[in-house]
Amino acid sequence: MSEVISIRVRRGLKKELEELGINYAEAVRKFLEELVARERRRRALERARALREELRKKGAFPPSAELIREDRDEASR
């Protein structure tokens, strides 16, 4: 099922789009789909960063220096 979204554009823009053979309906559809995908990724990244920070505060992640020291100690053996 689909929905209808209507927009107003400056005078003459629709005519220019038609003269240039631009399928504006398809272009707007594609833009809106990309906009939704971008926003979903942005929000997922925001949630992941917040979760990582929360876990870091609870001590779930050792400090980077400790991890580097462990790697170097193992490599020198």
UniProtKB/Swiss-Prot annotation:
Query: Which InterPro entries does the record associate with it?
Result: VapB3-like
Q: Which organism is it from?
A: Pyrobaculum aerophilum (strain ATCC 51768 / DSM 7523 / JCM 9630 / CIP 104966 / NBRC 100827 / IM2)
- Name the domain of life: Archaea
Q: What does this protein do?
A: Antitoxin component of a type II toxin-antitoxin (TA) system.
The gene it comes from is: vAPb3
Q: What is this protein called?
A: Putative antitoxin VapB3
What is the protein's quaternary organization?
Answer: Forms a complex with putative toxin VapC3, possibly VapB(2)-VapC(2).
Q: List the disulfide bonds.
A: none
List keywords of the entry alphabetically: Coiled coil, Toxin-antitoxin system
